Regions:
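Proteolytic-maturation and junctional protease-sensitive modules
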Residues: 471-476, 550, 587-643, 689-693, ...
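Short, compositionally biased P/S/T/A/G/V-rich stretches that sit at domain boundaries
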Residues: 164-221, 338-360, 434-453, 648-668
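Long, low-complexity serine/threonine/glycine- and acidic-rich segments characteristic of extracellular
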Residues: 133, 174, 189-192, 200-344, ...
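A short beta-turn/strand-edge loop motif at beta-sheet boundaries
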Residues: 220-222, 238-244, 366-373, 410, ...
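C-terminal beta-strand-rich structural cap/linker in extracellular carbohydrate-active enzymes
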Residues: 412, 634-653
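Contiguous beta-strand segments within globular domains
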Residues: 206-250, 354-362, 451-461, 589-597, ...
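Proteolytic processing hotspots in large secreted/extracellular or virion-associated proteins
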Residues: 529-538, 565-616
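Surface-exposed, glycine-biased beta-strand/turn segments
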Residues: 18-93, 99-104, 118-128, 133-134, ...
Length: 748
């Protein structure tokens, strides 16, 4: 029976493979793919391939196999003009961002637009109503919808309507290049975790030994639970384009701990992108790192295979780590390295002697019997900025110490930061040694407080510009009183030990104390809210005018969240701030579902022409769909990430310009086939194509509005008769500013 089953499975697999290989390419162009399956996009995975059309529209798109047209859809956003084809093998194929369809389908669209009095069309067909043979022309490539340039977006979906990877389902590319590795991140997954002497996530470069093999830069010293995340790309022979990898597997001591395969997924799990590609590292501009672990089954995407979770809680000692990263053509790259599991260690350093151009420093183990065999040293200036890595002129062992000779030109008037490495591979916490450097005055230097929210813990930071030799500690006043000694992890930067988010419950404030010959106390107002389990919660700004509301669905796990006032916000080119700017925190926390921010207006103030905006690094101040409650004068908006927000007044109407036809112009009937122009709003923006109206002699036109190019386009159905015409364009931005342009023209 087993043999029969194996033979049958082999036959079916071969049959599916041969069937898949029989598909044809959807464009009559060379195979150039600019973006592949599961590439990270804002809060979603890329569901298919972006196929290059050489920067032009109008290339013929053909059916990859026989079947029927299941659906056509037309809109001004998203995928624009889309055709869904049901193949005879049961799969669905999507051709998107099209410029147009067949003549028959274009006629059906025009009929539906007139019938529904809307540009938007969503038309379904019965099975076999619109038959299509392999290679049949089905439309033209374009840049419709939210496309950033001409290309064909191409998807394949299985019988459950799940996107599947075209590269592994009949559209593989000739590829002899192995995936390229970049960096490895080690993520703390418990409040007790320490990584190379540090409690925050650590990112390590990977050393290339060959095209097929990369290595850790050194043994990584870990204490307690961690997860690994990988920054890697794939390259395809003949193209200088970075692609998403097809999969990766993590092994510890030759046992598989985690497997990731970008084969298929459900649209309902798109939000898990931010738990699959590390959201914190991405928001901190470190790039895209594929997590090789899951926090819980709730955060497990369809790409995670098997029952292993990848959270590494390893026994003390050395553990070999191996990663196998592969592409769709089964080109494989390996990464290998070692994790050393042991409690964190400390060192101390002292200057033994000086010469004309060098100083001699001894680095001792502090509280450990294991000798120091190596070290890393960085020089910081008196303001606490790192300037240079200091390499030794010489080094030698002396009992358990390491004695090193360092150049004076790199160390004089600087703070030296030492991390010792002992004979077992343990990496110490940082130790600071000033060498003829100015020490900051702890009584007058201003300090700032910030908080980092990790996966399972919270780290409080107090920082200033300078180096301090005094001891420092925090007192947290909340549901319980906590006294926390601080460590100076860099000159002028003090960190608490990691706390559980629950330790911040009912927090009223934080007192920072620096103890020297004189004692200085600073009080910081800090009032986070705690989201736990099935409860909704709300955090308020210190001034009480901004509130951040969460539901039981907002977070994946217990989270402390709070609001900070922004002292020096990014300025406005147009418009006026009508509130303070508030930073919602933790800004790098992945959200499962939406939260709601509300900002209170003055009682005497109208909300006309106002809205809540957030700051986007690429787009600048960006409008959020806002609603006013007249009862409490709160302007509110939903959001899916924590941003800097403010109420902004925008009184500038949209601009309507560069229109064809021109004012008082005359055209021949056969040359007049399209009406086009620009409609643009600099601040609040145009929300939807329905916020623009266009009439020709009083009759509504059902036009396309391209949200990226800010372009209106209407294709005439036939030719205009001779005579004079009036075109009227009206545009309203998202806070109600309106513009109207009237164009009179004639046709011969």
């Amino acid at each position: 029976v087993k043999l029969y089953t194996l033979i049958l499975a082999t036959i079916l697999s071969l049959s599916n493979f041969l069937s898949a290989q029989d598909y044809i390419w959807p464009l009559k162009l060379g195979r150039v793919v600019s973006s592949n399956f599961a590439n990270p996009r804002p809060r979603r995975f890329h569901a298919g391939l972006d196929i290059s059309t050489e920067g032009k529209t109008g290339h013929e798109v053909v059916a990859i196999d026989s079947g029927y047209v299941e659906r056509i859809r037309v809109s001004s956003d998203g995928y624009g003009r889309i055709l869904y084809q049901k193949l005879n093998d049961g799969k669905t194929v999507v051709y998107a961002h099209l410029d147009g369809f067949t003549d028959l389908l274009n006629e059906i669209i025009r009929f539906e637009q007139k019938r529904n009095r809307s540009y938007d069309v969503d038309k379904y067909f019965r099975p076999n109503e619109m038959l299509v043979n392999k290679g049949d022309f089905i439309g033209y490539s374009g840049d419709s919808g939210g496309a950033f340039g001409p290309h064909l977006h191409f998807e394949m979906r299985d019988t459950l309507n799940r996107p599947i990877n075209p590269f592994t389902n009949g559209f593989g590319m000739d590829d002899r290049h192995r995936p390229k590795m970049d960096r490895l991140a080690v993520i703390p997954l418990s409040p007790e975790t320490v990584i190379n002497g540090v409690t925050l996530p650590q990112v390590f470069p990977l050393h290339r030994k060959s095209a097929a093999l990369y290595e850790f830069p050194d043994t990584i010293h870990v204490f307690n639970t961690v997860g690994l995340a990988l920054s890697a790309v794939d390259e395809i022979t003949g193209f200088a384009i970075k692609y998403n990898i097809t999969g990766a597997a993590l092994f510890v001591d030759d046992a598989e701990q985690f497997r990731l395969e970008f084969d298929h997924y459900s649209f309902t799990n798109n939000h898990l992108l931010e738990m699959s590609v590390d959201n914190s590292l991405r928001r901190l501009n470190d790039g895209n790192f594929h997590r090789l672990f899951v926090i819980s089954n709730e955060t497990k995407s369809d790409f995670v295979k098997g029952s292993s979770h990848g959270r590494l809680s390893l026994s003390p000692g050395y553990h070999s780590v191996s990663l196998r990263v592969f592409d769709h053509a089964q080109n494989v790259t390996r990464i290998q390295g070692t994790l050393y599991i042991a409690p964190p260690t400390r060192v101390r350093a002292e200057i033994l002697s000086e010469k004309a151009s060098t100083i001699t420093v001894a680095v001792y183990p502090d509280g450990s019997p294991f000798p120091i065999t190596d070290f890393v040293c960085y020089a910081f200036n008196a303001k606490g900025y790192p300037e240079v890595k200091v390499d030794p002129i010489s080094k030698e062992k002396s009992d358990r110490a390491l004695v090193v000779e360092l150049p004076k030109k790199l160390t004089r008037n600087r703070i030296l930061q030492f991390m010792g490495i002992n004979s077992l591979g343990g990496v110490s916490e940082a130790y600071h040694l000033p060498y003829k450097a100015e020490v900051a005055d702890h009584m007058t230097t201003p300090f700032q407080l910030s908080v980092s929210h990790l996966e399972k813990s919270v780290v409080i930071e107090v920082a200033a510009r300078g180096y301090f030799q005094q001891a420092a500690n925090l007192t947290l006043k909340g549901s319980k009183l906590l006294n926390l000694p601080l460590k100076q992890v860099r000159p002028g930067v003090f960190h608490s030990a990691p706390l559980k988010p629950q330790d911040l419950a009912e927090m009223e404030g934080i007192t920072f104390t620096v103890s020297g010959a004189a004692v200085r106390e600073m009080r910081f107002r800090f009032n986070p809210e705690l989201s736990v389990g099935a409860e909704s919660a709300a955090a308020f700004s210190i001034d009480g005018k901004c509130v951040l509301q969460t539901t039981k669905q907002t977070f994946y796990d217990t989270t402390a969240f709070w609001i900070e006032a922004v002292e020096n916000p990014v300025s406005l080119e147009t418009g006026r701030f009508k509130s303070k700017v508030y930073q919602l925190q933790p800004f790098d926390r992945a959200l499962k579902d939406s939260a709601r921010v509300s900002i209170q207006l003055k009682k005497s103030e109208s909300a006309e022409k106002m809205g809540i905006f957030y700051y986007d690094q690429k787009e600048g101040w960006t409008y959020l769909p806002s609603k006013l409650s007249n009862v409490d004068r709160l302007l509110s908006a939903p959001l899916y990430s924590f941003e800097a927000v403010a109420v902004i007044e925008d009184t500038v109407p949209p601009r309507i310009y560069d229109f064809f036809p021109g004012q008082n112009a005359s055209y021949s009937s056969t040359d007049f086939t399209t009406i086009s122009g620009k409609v643009e709003d600099d601040l609040a923006g145009i929300g939807k194509d329905k916020d623009i109206q266009m009439t020709l002699d009083g009759e509504s036109l059902y036009f396309e509005y391209h949200p990226i190019k800010k372009e209106v386009r209407y294709r005439l159905d036939g030719f205009l008769g001779a005579g004079q015409y009036q075109l009227v364009i009206t545009a309203t931005d998202q806070v109600g500013n309106r513009s109207t342009k009237e164009i009179t023209f004639s046709v011969n």
